[in-house]
Curated annotation (Swiss-Prot):
Subcellular location: Cytoplasm
Gene: zapD
UniProt GO BP: division septum assembly; FtsZ-dependent cytokinesis
Keyword Cell division appears in the UniProt entry: yes
Protein name per its UniProtKB record: Cell division protein ZapD
InterPro entries, per database record: ZapD (IPR009777), ZapD_C (IPR027462), ZapD_sf (IPR036268)
Top-rank taxon, per record: Bacteria
Transmembrane segments: none
Length: 247
């Protein structure tokens, strides 16, 4: 049984966007294969939200900058005694390859935007009950196609995101691994510290405490207030130990 809960909090806008994209891409595959209306609406709603996120910022530009930054960080470890040089060089090559694929890929999400079925469903998602069979006969008949035909189309849609997914996964993995967890203690449910130009806070809390963190701040400084899940009867201990990584 799980005894700890991991919370992650972005300290800048680019990390906020990346975490949202990661979450939405993960949600795309949760209910596959699509066999009914519920699974279809879950999938198309997440596709629609992904496209909304893509339209708000320069996702490709920010990711390419981060891929370059991670390569420069790894370069500083070349020649350092005790460091696995082959691993460092392999990571650098993987980052270069991910960058090359991303920079040569079509506009992120364009394949999904141009798909007729996705466009039709997106138009109806904001309408309460707007995806009924009489509103979307196209979706209705799509759900009655052979399963293999639907699966193939869904795989094609998801594969169109591969250049983004590959680059984003590498970047987030390296950022998450950039700092170890360290034991910290809050006093009366409050903790604050300097961020040290971090992009991401990762916080491990004991599930027994039934507390959750409210985090505010930016890369230079942040504050954490611990709140009880049970707002009426829950209590916050005077001293609370937790694990924190500033990545």
């Amino acid at each position: 049984m799980q005894t700890q809960v991991l919370f992650e909090h972005p300290l800048n806008e680019k990390m906020r966007t990346w975490l949202r994209i990661e979450f939405l891409i993960q949600q795309l595959t949760v209910n596959l294969p699509i066999v009914d209306h519920a699974g279809a609406l879950h999938f198309f709603r997440n596709v629609s939200e992904l496209l909304d996120v893509f339209e708000r910022g320069e996702v490709r530009t920010e990711l390419l900058k981060e891929l370059d930054r991670q390569q420069r960080k790894l370069q500083t470890w070349i020649g350092v005694p005790g460091v696995d040089q082959s691993r460092i060089e392999a990571l650098i090559q993987q980052l270069k390859a991910a960058g090359s694929v991303l920079i040569s890929a079509p506009r992120i999400g364009q394949f999904l935007r141009e798909d007729r079925l996705i466009a039709l469903v997106r138009q109806r998602l904001s309408i309460p009950g707007g995806c009924c069979s009489f509103d979307l006969p196209t979706l209705h008949i799509w759900l009655h196609l052979p399963q293999a035909q639907r699966d193939c189309q869904v795989e094609t849609w998801i594969a169109s995101l591969n250049p983004l997914t590959q680059a984003l996964t590498m970047v987030l993995d390296l950022i998450r691994q950039s700092a170890p967890f360290r034991k910290q203690t809050s006093l009366n449910g409050f903790y604050q510290d300097n961020g040290g130009d971090a992009d991401l806070l990762r916080l491990n809390l004991s599930l027994d405490s039934q507390l959750y963190p409210q985090i505010s701040g930016h890369k230079s400084r942040f504050a954490i207030r611990f709140m009880p899940l049970d707002t009426e009867n829950g209590q916050v201990p005077e001293r609370l130990d937790f694990e924190l990584a500033c990545c």
